[in-house]
Regions:
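C-terminal helix-rich "cap/oligomerization" subdomain common to oxidoreductases
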Residues: 3, 19, 79-81, 237, ...
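NAD(P)-dependent dehydrogenases' Rossmann-like dinucleotide-binding region
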Residues: 133-136, 152-173, 187-195, 208-219, ...
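Contiguous beta-strand/loop segments that form the cofactor/metal-binding neighborhood of enzyme cores
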Residues: 197-280, 311-322
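Hydrophobic residues in well-ordered beta-strands that form the structural core
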Residues: 105-106, 130-132, 273
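N-terminal Rossmann-like dinucleotide-binding module
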Residues: 2-3, 9-59
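Mid-domain beta-loop-alpha active-site segment that forms a flexible
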Residues: 133-141, 172-208, 224-228, 331-332
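Beta-loop-alpha module in the N-terminal Rossmann-like domain of NAD(P)-dependent dehydrogenases
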Residues: 27, 59-122
Length: 350
């Protein structure tokens, strides 16, 4: 008799998941991709009544739980996802893992190194997963396709990764916790976490040293604990260079929340990703890849509808079969660790 594949097993078993923490809009995209990948959303909870009501409008058929414990005690649920207040995410994840479930959390996953260390202990004790939705790669077709091209050697050996993640602030729409350092962690540990994960992924590095990190509040004195600019320089364990810059200065005139780009330099060429838009307006939509190599003119690839978001199906399969094909736990947590180290470096050198 032919043995079933992991993918077939995943379809047969169909993973049920719940939500704990609805404090950031990212949770809706996370749920959408998990459902599209075959997951079944069965329940949701947030301690804030308004957040629960908003979620119920978007998912009217999903049960709104009366408490966090109701979800943790539900033996039919094997995965919990969430986007709680950033400083609360690790503690929720610890409770989730101790209840025998895997945890899939919005970035940034931590605000302190002590949270990271405690999570590592609980992972070792429980054998559960603490996975992070680094959406600037995992929900970007240009990024996922670029990863394939790099593995094919399109630009030779990767020498440097440069990532830029500007964001639109839209301050009136932000909750109060968003501007409190203890709760959001700082601009590097928040939105720059995407860049650290991509540095590791695109370069193949497994560790790095923080050379320099800086944060500033250039233009928002009304929010004294807020940081509207951050930059970091890294050197990978194998010598690869990394530079990343994030800010909250996307102007209202831009047709996107941010002109997110990355440049990857190799021995035989370079690659540029324009993730959200082509600012020239010449190419509609997002997910643009430009590759320039020795002896060949610049090649343009529109990655839209080319690859989808393959992480999510692979992650569901990993949860069911206890594998690590979507992303290793070591990679996930190393990105978080470097992010926190850089934030700490910047905080100490203000």
């Amino acid at each position: 008799m032919r043995r079933s594949s992991h993918k077939e097993d995943s379809i047969m078993k169909k993973l049920k998941f719940s939500v704990i923490g609805i404090q950031h809009g990212h949770i809706y995209g996370m749920c959408q991709d998990l459902i599209k990948a075959g997951g079944e959303l069965v329940s949701a909870y947030d301690k804030d009544e308004k957040a629960r009501a908003e979620f119920a409008k978007k998912y009217p058929d999903v049960k709104i739980a009366s408490s966090e414990n109701e979800i943790l005690e539900d033996q039919s649920v094997s995965l919990v996802t969430g986007a709680a207040i950033t400083s609360e995410r690790a503690d929720i994840g610890i409770r989730v893992m101790k209840s025998g479930k895997d945890y899939f959390v919005d970035k940034g996953p931590f605000t302190t190194l002590s949270q990271l260390e405690e999570v590592k202990k609980v992972i070792a004790e429980t054998g559960r997963k603490y996975m992070v939705c680094y959406s600037e790669r995992l929900q970007s077709e240009a990024s996922e396709l670029a990863g394939i091209y790099l593995k094919e050697g399109r630009i030779g050996k990767v020498l440097q990764y440069i990532g830029m993640g500007p964001h639109r602030l839209s301050a009136p729409a932000r909750p109060e916790w968003f501007f409190k350092k203890e709760q959001y962690g700082g601009i590097i540990s928040d939105i720059c976490s995407h860049q650290f994960e991509q540095f590791l992924y695109f370069t193949g590095e497994t560790d790095a040293k923080v050379n320099f990190a800086r944060v500033s509040n250039f233009a928002h004195p009304e929010y004294p604990e807020f940081e509207d600019f951050g930059e970091v320089s890294l050197t990978g364990a194998n010598g690869t260079s990394g530079y990343m810059k994030v800010d909250w200065f996307t102007p209202d005139g831009l047709a996107s929340w941010g002109d997110v780009r990355c440049f990857i330099i190799g021995t035989d060429g370079f690659m540029e990703l324009r993730k959200n838009l082509d600012i020239t307006g010449a190419k509609p939509g997002g997910d643009h890849i430009f590759i320039t190599t020795n002896g060949k003119p610049t090649e343009y690839i529109n990655a839209t509808d080319k690859i989808g978001h393959p992480f999510f199906e692979a992650f569901i399969d990993d949860c069911i079969n206890r594998t690590e094909n979507a992303m290793t736990q070591a990679h996930c947590l190393k990105a978080a660790e470097l992010t926190l180290l850089a934030q700490d470096f910047a905080d100490k050198n203000k």
